[in-house]
Regions:
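ASCE P-loop NTPase helicase motor core
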Residues: 93, 98, 124, 174-285, ...
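Beta-strand cores of modular interaction/reader domains in eukaryotic scaffold and signaling proteins
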Residues: 68, 88-90, 109, 119-121, ...
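Conserved helicase motor core of SF1/SF2 NTP-dependent helicases
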Residues: 234-236, 244, 334, 348-629
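Pre-ATPase regulatory/linker segments immediately N-terminal to the P-loop/RecA-like helicase/translocase core
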Residues: 2-18, 74, 78-201, 257, ...
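Short, conserved secondary-structure segments in the cores of folded domains
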Residues: 77, 109, 333, 555-556
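A helicase ATPase "motif cassette" and its flanking acidic/Ser/Thr-rich regulatory loops
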Residues: 1-83, 147
């Protein structure tokens, strides 16, 4: 084993140890939460639905037993159920000693989730009739063993790789050895700006790895779509992945708009005919051979119910039916995967049995800066070269264990490669979203002042003679934060009132008719879930906001990643005598928050508390300077 190989293997073994710490920490936290957290709190947190109405059970097109349920209460609470997450069903019953919860002895996997409807695939032997008859039925998220198992398997495989492409990429990513490039004259793409053209050309020249670093509003997705389109002129098929289902949906939809055939493994987070049209399950159902396959599957299920005389004739018939079903499944899959130019999935979804044995020339990972390194290796093992796109100055991957975080588990593969191989990185430098004054602080602090505004957005605004960025100081208002629990964080009731007062005042200045005519939209952001829920309740109850509810979104910073609004109002919450700001000291979150605004940014928070931190002191000074104070 040479020095480079030894170094990379050692680093990945350390990654595995840190992942084990995170796994054990999260599993213990889940166990503790399950045992000690009341149902009402789980529902409020979005981790459980109760009560449920059982809608139906059926076999889906992939021959999986599925259960459909809807929640009948607390429909205003945003939930955390999404495709691929494990869940368990329970019943709430009344006993002499009070209410008790009994869990059913099986787990399922979410195959579809929207606002109030959930479809869960369950084992064939799941007691569906009992579920249907249960009063007080509920469902809650279960600990996600699968994602960890896939990450551990991926790390073990890459650690053990010898004398193959995976081993080469592993050693390259952990060394200072330059990545290989092809040499050819740059290709012109007149519809892209100079940095975007450079990024696409760098992707095309890369033999090993390329990185598209896209600060807010710089057209990262546009650039990535063009790079994929051009790559497909040279390769028959590529794999496109992202950490979240939402990110996979977004890039998939843009690729379809570009005229590229996409096959989406897994179900989308939002449902419309366009999104569903390129999912594997919908394409499978639409195949001409599917009705025949469905009939054979029904015959197999019917035959299994014949318990009396399972003689040789029964077994021969069952074998014939199974053989024919497998033959049809293989034929359908061969055609579906053969016709698609892009296979799209989450990083963990790339481990699907549907992709068993498949290799790709190029893997594109979008939002790579939000993914744990171990998750990236799940997909990388299927590819010869890798293109990463994202922004490590925005939201990081979620790491809950402080020990794992301090050990470096939160350091992403994208960050490692950027640090070791700056020559493979292209920074996109023209943003098309924000007024110049909103953008400038972020550009200076996070991107060395290299990001500029496109002329068409530089001076965009809503009101004449209006300062695009405002800070409303709550220091003298009596606003104080309150701790409301580990999962929800903190609230600041007075600040919530001041936040909505600021929005009311601005709406009044704009005028109701103009807001409607110009479809002006608003985002209200807070770092804390409890404050978000408080603000949502206040918006719902306030008569003033009744005409505007369709244009106002209230969410956490994470919930706004990748989105933008004409007006953004940020409630910082923290207000204390000690200058404690908690995870607001992770400045990447604030970079996301302040760069969601196109034309107006209003920050509401305690100057006395926040400006004890250098970043917020600088930001407040910048706001004052912009206002000419």
């Amino acid at each position: 084993m040479n020095n480079i190989q030894s170094s990379s293997v050692q680093a990945l073994r350390q990654q595995r140890l840190l992942l084990e710490i995170e796994y054990n920490s999260e599993k213990e936290a889940f166990r503790r939460q399950t045992e000690t957290t009341g149902l009402a709190r789980k529902v409020k947190r979005g981790d459980a639905w109760h009560p449920l109405r059982f809608v139906r059970s059926y076999y889906n097109s992939l021959n999986q037993l599925s259960v459909e349920v809807v929640r009948t209460a607390d429909t205003d609470i945003e939930h955390n159920f999404e495709f691929g997450r494990p869940v368990c069903f329970f019943r709430m019953s009344e006993a002499a000693e009070g209410k008790s919860i009994r869990y059913f002895n099986f787990t399922g996997t979410v195959s579809y989730a929207d606002g109030d409807r959930l479809v869960v695939t369950v084992p064939d032997n799941a007691p569906v009739a009992e579920l249907q008859a249960t009063e007080g039925l509920g469902v809650q998220l279960f600990f996600d063993e699968t994602s960890y198992r896939l990450m551990f398997e991926a790390l073990d495989r890459v650690i053990g790789a010898r004398d193959n492409r995976l081993a080469y990429l592993r050693d390259l990513f952990y060394s200072g050895v330059p990545a290989a490039e092809l040499s050819f004259a740059p290709i012109s793409f007149p519809w892209l700006n100079r940095a975007q053209q450079e990024a696409v050309n760098k992707v095309l020249r890369a033999k090993d790895v390329a990185i598209v670093h896209g600060p807010p509003g710089t057209g990262k997705t546009t650039t990535l779509v063009e790079a994929i389109y051009e790559t497909l002129r040279r390769e028959s098929q590529v794999l496109v992945c992202a950490q979240s289902n939402m990110a996979v949906d977004w890039i998939s939809e843009r690729l379809v708009d570009r005229g590229i055939s996409v096959l989406r493994i897994g179900n989308p987070t939002k449902v419309n005919d366009k999104m569903l049209s390129f999912t594997y399950e919908r394409r499978f159902e639409a195949h001409p051979d599917y009705p025949q396959l469905w009939s054979i599957r029904q015959a197999i299920r019917k035959l299994r119910q014949e318990r009396k005389r399972r003689d040789n004739g029964w077994h021969q018939k069952m074998d014939r039916l199974k053989s024919r079903a497998v033959e049809l499944e293989l034929r359908i899959n061969s055609q579906l995967f053969g016709e698609a130019k892009v296979i799209a999935s989450t990083l963990t979804g790339s481990a699907s049995h549907l992709l068993s044995g498949q290799k790709f020339g190029t893997l594109f990972i979008d939002e790579a800066a939000q993914a744990l390194e171990a998750a990236c290796w799940i997909a990388i093992r299927r590819a010869s070269r890798v293109v990463l796109a994202g922004d490590h100055c925005q939201l990081p991957p979620t790491v809950k264990s402080i020990a794992a975080l301090k050990g470096g588990l939160g350091t992403t593969l994208m960050e490692r490669i950027v640090a070791r191989k700056p020559s493979v990185v292209t920074l996109l430098t023209v943003q098309y979203r924000m007024n110049e004054q909103i953008m400038r602080f972020s550009s200076n602090w996070f991107y060395d002042g290299r990001v500029e505004s496109a002329p068409e957005v530089k001076y965009r605004g809503i009101l004449d003679y209006d300062n695009p960025i405002t800070w409303i100081d709550t220091s003298e208002s009596g606003a104080k934060e309150e701790f409301v629990g580990e999962s929800f964080g903190r609230i600041n009731k007075t600040e919530a009132e001041l936040t909505l007062d600021a929005l009311k005042n601005y709406f009044t200045k704009i005028g109701r008719q103009r807001i409607a005519d110009e479809h002006i939209d608003v985002g209200v952001i807070s770092p804390y879930r409890a404050q978000v829920q408080l603000l949502r309740r206040m918006v719902r109850k306030a008569e003033f906001f009744k005409p505007y509810r369709g244009c106002i979104t209230v969410n956490t910073v994470d919930g706004f990643q990748g989105q933008e609004r004409d007006i953004i109002v940020i409630s910082l919450v923290r207000s204390n005598d000690d200058g404690q700001i908690g995870f607001l000291s992770d400045l990447r979150r604030m970079n996301v928050a302040i760069t969601r605004a196109r034309m107006k940014l209003i920050i509401v928070g305690s100057v006395q508390t926040m400006t004890r931190h250098a970043f917020y002191k600088e930001l407040y000074g910048y706001v004052q300077e912009s206002a000419g104070i």
